[in-house]
Curated annotation (Swiss-Prot):
Glycosylated sites: N169, N260, N379
Transmembrane regions: 7-23
Alphabetical list of CDD domains matching this protein: CYP71-like
Pathway noted in the entry: Secondary metabolite biosynthesis; terpenoid biosynthesis
Native organism: Lactuca sativa
Positions with a binding annotation for heme: C432
GO biological process: sesquiterpene biosynthetic process; terpenoid biosynthetic process
InterPro entries in the cross-refs: Cyt_P450, Cyt_P450_CS, Cyt_P450_E_grp-I, Cyt_P450_sf
GO cellular component terms attached to this protein's record: endoplasmic reticulum membrane
Protein name: Germacrene A hydroxylase
Family indicated by similarity: Belongs to the cytochrome P450 family.
Swiss-Prot/TrEMBL keywords: Endoplasmic reticulum, Glycoprotein, Heme, Iron, Membrane, Metal-binding, Monooxygenase, Oxidoreductase, Signal-anchor, Transmembrane, Transmembrane helix
Length: 488
């Protein structure tokens, strides 16, 4: 049977392509280890059907803790060990201080003018200074203490009013509580469109997880439209922008001292000053950072902590005994009551080890060509630091997959990124600037939930039947909502 002209041309094209591939001159440069790759998509086929942080960890265990990934058009290096994390985030920190441009950052984050995604440069340095001295200083975080205490008590009352023995959707309750805390910290009060604002933030977070086609083929603009990503993000941004505009328009700037300023007060003061002029869009981008990133990371950490404690009755009993002995029947918990509770803090540290809010941190980008241990790294190469893999490295952590809070009893590891085998908030110039606020929004809610109530799974299920499946978005959440039965 004769071949059609079309088939003949197709076969000839394939043969020519394979010939060119086979006869292509081999590079004399030292190449980073990598898995087998395919044309066009690179290594993406290795990550299909996996949680990205777990898939990348599995590849690193086969090919090395410093390896190369080709994600579509994007050349990427992956760091999966404390040794390489320390080398890159200290010696080469400024070289990899940029952020890769993304479609989400362009549309949602007002052209990458928020704190998280802003490119490295003078604008970002001013934002970082603003966070350190004003928005996220220890003093400013402390000033929101009464808000945290009030909203935690509101959650306790809500659970008690629902009645003992009835299942509670803790996922929803925790997310709503922390969203309200951050709304009051940002705007001085809960906003009237709180539920709509929260739902929009949740949708943004769902859109930012994983490896998106728009970001792995950035030059193929038609894919941004074919995938529907640009249209979805544009629609979300329009709703978000209208809501934030209304919030800002209705906001009454505080006339009291700086100590009592809300986050929006600070931003509006600076917007109208020559000290650090901000545009209206800059203000909105920063507010979205404070609310979106803060709500998702803190609520996920509280959920994972409770989930791990449910599966580990010994640890649950120990942390509840510590709380109840220290508080001795006190009704409302104040932050001073729990600052020195050792085991509660061990539980939080171990939760952050197993479930870092951003397991792949936020990707960085190389600002200039660099020689890294003999490997030539090109400008614009993407950097992924897999803190999920680092935090579970069996070379540094005994029984690395197990929940054992006691491992930190005599462990001086610094939670703020000084020790590179434990990086819950990243490290270096681009580490999470909101770590202090995030920890405050974890410690008090967790203490209240554990102090006031005993918890069990619905329908008589045993503790080891709790589903711990992950869902990957902007942060790694539980795939199923945490439904538990309180008793008090």
């Amino acid at each position: 049977m004769e071949l059609s002209i079309t088939t003949s041309i197709a076969l000839a094209t394939i043969v020519f392509f394979l010939y060119k591939l086979a006869t292509r001159p081999k590079s004399t440069k030292k190449q980073l280890p990598e898995a087998s790759r395919l044309p066009i998509i690179g290594h993406m086929h290795h990550l299909i059907g996996t949680m990205p942080h777990r898939g990348v960890m599995d590849l690193a265990r086969k090919h090395g803790s410093l390896m190369h990934l080709q994600l579509g058009e994007v050349s990427t290096i992956v760091v999966s060990s404390p040794k390489w994390a320390k080398e890159i985030l200290t010696t080469y920190d400024i070289t990899f201080a940029n952020r890769p441009e993304t479609l989400t950052g362009e549309i949602i984050a007002y052209h990458n003018t928020d704190i998280v995604l802003a490119p490295y440069g003078e604008y970002w340095r001013q934002l970082r200074k603003l966070c350190t001295l004003e928005l996220l200083s220890v003093k400013k975080v402390k000033s929101f203490q009464s808000i945290r205490e009030e909203e935690c008590w509101n959650l306790v009352k809500e659970v008690k009013e629902s009645g003992s023995g009835k299942p509670i959707n803790l996922s929803e309750s925790i997310f709503t509580m922390i969203a309200t805390i951050l709304s009051r910290a940002a705007f001085g009060k809960g906003i009237k469109d709180q539920r709509e604002f929260t739902e929009i933030v949740k949708e943004i977070l769902r859109q930012t997880g994983g490896f998106d086609v728009a970001d792995i083929f950035p030059s193929k603009k038609f894919l941004h439209h074919l995938s529907g990503k640009r249209a979805r993000l544009t629609s979300i941004h329009k709703k978000l922008d209208n809501l934030i505009n209304n919030i800002v328009a209705e906001h009454h700037v505080s006339t009291s001292s700086k100590a009592n300023e809300t986050l929006l007060d600070v931003l509006l003061r600076l917007k109208d000053s020559a000290e650090f002029p901000l545009t209206a869009d800059n203000v909105k981008a920063i507010i979205l950072d404070m609310f979106g990133a803060g709500t998702d990371t803190s609520s996920a950490t509280v959920e994972w902590a409770i989930s791990e404690l449910i599966r580990c009755p010994r640890a649950m009993e120990k942390v509840q005994a510590e709380l109840r002995q220290a508080l001795n029947g006190k009704e409302k918990i104040q932050e001073e009551d729990i600052q020195d509770l050792a085991y509660l803090n061990l539980v939080i540290r171990e939760t952050l080890r197993l479930h870092p809010p951003l397991p792949l941190v936020m990707p960085r980008e190389c600002r200039e060509p660099v020689n890294l241990a003999g490997y030539e790294i090109a400008n614009k190469t993407k950097l992924i630091v897999n803190v999920f893999a680092i935090n579970r490295d069996p070379e540094y952590w005994k029984d690395a997959e197990a929940f054992i809070p006691e491992r930190f009893e005599n462990n001086p590891n610094n939670i703020m990124g000084a020790d590179y085998e434990y990086l819950p908030f990243g490290a270096g110039r681009r580490m999470c600037p909101g770590a202090a606020l995030g920890l405050a929004n974890v410690q008090l809610p967790l203490a209240n939930i554990l102090y006031h109530f005993n918890w069990k799974l619905p329908n008589g299920a045993s503790h080891d039947q709790l589903d711990m499946t992950e869902s990957f978005g902007a942060t790694v959440q539980r795939k199923t909502e945490l439904l538990l039965v309180p008793s008090f």
